[in-house]
Design a protein with these regions (language model features):
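Flavin (FAD/FMN)-binding glycine-rich loop and adjacent Rossmann-like elements that form
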Residues: 41-44, 49, 69, 75-80, ...
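Conserved N-terminal/central alpha/beta ligand/cofactor-binding core
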Residues: 16, 38-63, 104, 110-111, ...
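Conserved beta-strand-loop-beta-strand element in the redox core of flavoprotein oxidoreductases
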Residues: 212-231
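N-terminal Rossmann-fold NAD(P) dinucleotide-binding loop
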Residues: 98
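Beta1/beta-strand and adjacent pyrophosphate-binding region of the FAD-binding site
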Residues: 84-95
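C-terminal segment of N-terminal export signals and the immediately downstream linker at the start
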Residues: 5, 26-83
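N-terminal export signals
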Residues: 2-4, 10-32
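Loop/turn elements at helix/coil->beta-strand transitions in domains of secreted/extracellular proteins
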Residues: 87-88, 108-111, 198-200, 234-235, ...
């Protein structure tokens, strides 16, 4: 058949997707407006046996140069930005914290938008191939463990287990509440959970770069995409960027620290080695005990050097170095009996930046308080312990409120903690805990017409408890 015009239904039928895709209503179309594609031609390409949809796209106001040279300096004049979207709450960053914040906000009744720079949710959990969900529980008398990161985090883990996306073990190093989860399964599950919320709009491939500010109050965010720079207006903003990017742009004070820049490599054909061969080579960086969500695959987590996780040159050097080290490991393994077929399946698309900015908030949680398990009247959740040797500790709501800035909350690894506490709050489940609290608070405060700082924390705690969160 030569090139021909086809209806959308015919196009889907030829792909074998007709009934499913049309019934779902979201396989094709503009996710921002939820409108169908405009009339146009689906062109069959006989060279590849596929179809392409071709239509003209009108230019946008942002499709113009915005910087110029003058007197040897690069200048960027003020210009009007298109308003892409409006919401009650906008969450910037779709990692574990942003995922939970957006869900919590939408479920609390607020019209919510989630802006994420990559094409999937999960952040370092999925795009960074971190996999293992640690810090979910605390050790209790008798050697048992108590799950403390419930709420949205608990829901996510239960659903991941039900869909067969996780490996659960009961040994002392992992326990029944610290699964290793397939990153692709996690992406799909997160997609399903956010797409089920009518109050939630997700915008991928959009990088939050600035804030819309009115004095000390935040009125929205500015994001960059292939369509140019645009704005989303909102009553409340939740910074889940991990680096406190939004709070930084809003002028919040912060402390910047260095940490290891990690890198994860996924290797294949490991399953051909015998358990004895794996055990014998464990000291050389080879896999020890099979604990992977995909049979025959092995995830190598490189700790990486200390570095500035915001510095472009350092990040670039780390990317080069990690990939080279990964390939050298493969070469070493291929020269070892049982590992001859080893190959690189995947490398993380997101470098393992563990900590950068710690935002100055209304309260800073220190190590002494975490060790003493200090009780706070405004506790919004708990952090577990990945070793099960220490008890869980409370996280106060005030650690989510950037000092001197209104209408903004922060969640994830940039909350107000001392540097020596960061390794206990940057964990995947704890980020979900602070994200859920921040999203709930943002929605409640927007509905009540008060700032997050003026929100009745007792009402917030009641709502979190009603939703399954563990507060003590």
């Amino acid at each position: 058949m030569s090139m021909l015009q086809m209806t959308k239904r015919e196009f889907l039928r030829r792909l074998g997707l007709g009934g499913v895709a049309l019934a779902g209503g979201a396989a094709f179309g503009d996710e921002a407006t939820r409108e169908p594609l405009p009339p146009g031609d689906y062109i069959a390409d006989p060279r590849y046996g596929t179809c392409r949809y071709i239509r003209d796209i009108p230019k946008m106001p942002t499709d113009v140069p915005s910087a110029f040279l003058k007197g040897g300096k690069v200048l960027q004049p003020a210009r009007e930005l298109p308003v892409f979207h409006e919401a009650d709450v906008v969450v910037v960053g779709g990692g574990p914290a942003g995922f939970a914040a957006a869900l919590a906000s939408a479920r609390t009744g607020a019209k919510t938008a989630l802006v994420e720079r990559y094409g999937s949710l999960g952040g370092l959990f999925t795009n960074g191939l971190v996999l293992i969900v640690i810090g979910t529980a605390e050790g209790v008398r008798g050697g048992a463990q108590r799950l403390v990161t419930r709420g949205i985090c608990g829901e996510f883990m239960e659903r991941a287990k039900a869909m067969g996306a996780g490996v659960y073990r009961t040994d002392r190093h992992h326990g029944p509440h610290q699964p290793t989860i397939d990153p692709e399964g996690a992406k799909v599950l997160m997609d399903r959970m956010v797409r089920a919320e009518q109050n939630l709009d997700v915008f991928f491939h959009a990088w939050g770069v600035d804030v819309v500010q009115d004095g000390a109050e935040i009125r929205g965010v500015v994001f960059e995409s292939k369509q140019g720079r645009q704005a989303i207006l909102a009553k409340r903003v939740v910074d889940c960027t991990g680096d406190g990017d939004v709070a930084f742009q809003a002028g919040a004070d912060f402390r910047q620290i260095t940490h290891n820049l990690g890198f994860v490599t996924q290797l294949g054909s490991i399953g051909r080695a015998t358990p004895e061969q794996m055990s014998a080579k464990a000291a050389d960086g080879f896999p020890k005990v099979p604990n992977e969500p995909i049979p025959g695959a092995f995830w190598r987590n490189w700790l990486g050097p200390q570095g500035n996780g915001l510095a472009v040159r350092e990040l670039t050097a780390a990317e080069f170095g990690h990939r080279e080290a990964s390939w050298r490991l493969v070469e070493k393994m291929r020269a070892t009996p049982g590992f001859e077929s080893t190959y690189v399946m995947n490398t993380c698309s997101q470098l393992g930046v563990r900590a950068t900015r710690l935002i100055k908030t209304d309260y800073t949680l220190d190590m002494g308080e975490t060790n003493a398990q200090t009780v706070f009247d405004d506790a919004i959740g708990l952090s577990g312990d990945d070793t099960f040797t220490r008890g869980a500790f409370q996280i106060p709501y005030r650690t989510l409120l950037p000092s001197g800035v209104e209408n903004l909350l922060v969640a994830g690894r940039a909350i107000g903690v001392a540097p020596n506490v960061i390794d206990r709050v940057r964990l995947i489940p704890v980020c979900m805990v602070t994200g859920e609290a921040a999203g709930t608070a943002a929605a409640l405060s927007a509905t009540a017409g008060v700032t997050p700082r003026a929100l009745d924390v007792r009402a917030l705690r009641r709502r979190l408890a009603d939703n399954g969160a563990c507060l003590a």
